[in-house]
Amino acid sequence: MIVADANLLINFVCATPFSEMARRVKARDSDWVSPHLWKAEVLNGLLTMHRAQLMDLDRAVLAYRNAAAATVVGVHDDDPDAVLTVARDAGLSAYDAHYVSMARALGVFLVTEDKKILRTCPDVARSMRQFLSPPEPPITVREKPAAYKTRRKGKSTA
């Protein structure tokens, strides 16, 4: 399970430079959840794309329906105290803090391309590239080898 923010959802359902990567995120983990406000944020992002003449209004409506039908599996309520605390501590908007708060409450990653969230909440926020990268191998701590003289002590030299 991951928390999917609005930009991940838009990249998944629209033709963008990040669409292929968003599809790979979905293939790796298809259980996406978001706070209730994802709908308004996706609609706002699609409207922004329409106003920039990147898509017509019919395509924006279709993209929203695709996001609603195919991407977000679960929607969760947030604790307002936690949201406001995250917003205050990380310097985020309450909108962005909803996603971070949800990821922390569920103990999962928030996959986002929002640079401020990635910078201020590295405990839960991952870019698509980070999420798709293989995990770092565990660090192996090796004991310092004993000096040759110590290792040879007690052995006979016949």
What is each residue range found by the language model?
Residues 1, 73, 100-158:
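Acidic, PIN/NYN-like endoribonuclease modules and their adjacent C-terminal/linker elements
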Residues 4, 33-34, 94-97, 112:
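Short beta-strand scaffold positions
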Residues 8-9, 92, 106, 110:
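Generic leucine side-chain signal with a strong bias for well-ordered alpha-helical environments
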Residues 1-37, 49, 53-58, 142-158:
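Short, well-structured N-terminal submotif of metal-dependent ribonuclease cores
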